[in-house]
Amino acid sequence: MKKILTILTLSFFIFTNSFAGSDGELNLSKKSKPVKDCFEPLNRITFAINMGLDKVIFKPVAKGYRVLPSPVRAGVSNALDNLTNLVTIPNNVLQGDLKKAGINTGRFAINTTIGVLGIFDVAEFIGFPKYEKEDYGQTLGTYGIGPGCYLVLPVIGPSTVRDTAGSFINVMGGDPWYNASVNANNEYLSDKAYAASRVMTGVDFRAKNIETLDNLEKNSMDFYASVRSLYLQDRQMKISNTEDIVETMDDSDWEEIEAN
């Protein structure tokens, strides 16, 4: 039972990255294709269970993490963000954006070495721009593959059929960090290193968005529908690479909701 809970928790932290863009900004486009909520009754039940788990586990842990000094949390965020380049770069290539692939490769090399494993974003300081994160779900979308039905996965949260498939590509060989730490079986890295990075990604994300999610829940007539709309619009924006923004959530990831 303990092992099952551990796997579910890690799964949640793996999927939280699908919300966060570069610097964690969540941007919503004005136009997005409608996505069917084929399993809405079941999705709502799963959503309610997830919210219960968040209140008793994830949110308290996130509050504890926020006790750490801001520079420490910033360094952790930078290091975790640096690792996401290992998924972003191959997706830049798959999407035909070789310029961004080259820049992100340079960012990763500089920050991993001079920036001490990514703790310091030296690359941005010397002029390497920071682009939005890319993932396999986005790449499938650029290939014209539709999102399929909207899903709320246990513990993991909002997704679609396409995004779920894209996320599983990571653990099927599409994530070099997963391959190096879990599959390589070397003396320097192990599955514990990967698990730790995923857990910290989730904790960092949740800690940045405590007030945002509280405000969203407080001001929503239907919290489930609000989260669904937020997720689907954000994913569509990232796939289309639009800069037409209706709302931006920030605090590195989702600090506050600003309605135009």
Roles of regions detected by a PLM:
Residues 1-4:
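Positively charged n-region of N-terminal signal peptides that target proteins for export
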Residues 7-14:
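Bacterial N-terminal signal peptides
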Residues 15-20:
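Sec/Tat signal peptide C-region and signal peptidase I cleavage site
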Residues 21, 25-30, 143-260:
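A structured, mid-to-C-terminal "fold-capping" secondary-structure block
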Residues 27-43:
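Disorder-to-helix initiation segments
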Residues 41-42, 71-78, 101-111:
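Alpha-helical scaffold segments that form or flank carboxylate-/histidine-based iron centers
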Residues 56-74, 126, 137:
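Membrane interface segments of multi-pass transport proteins and intramembrane proteases
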Residues 82, 89-161:
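Mid-length scaffold segments of soluble, non-membrane domains
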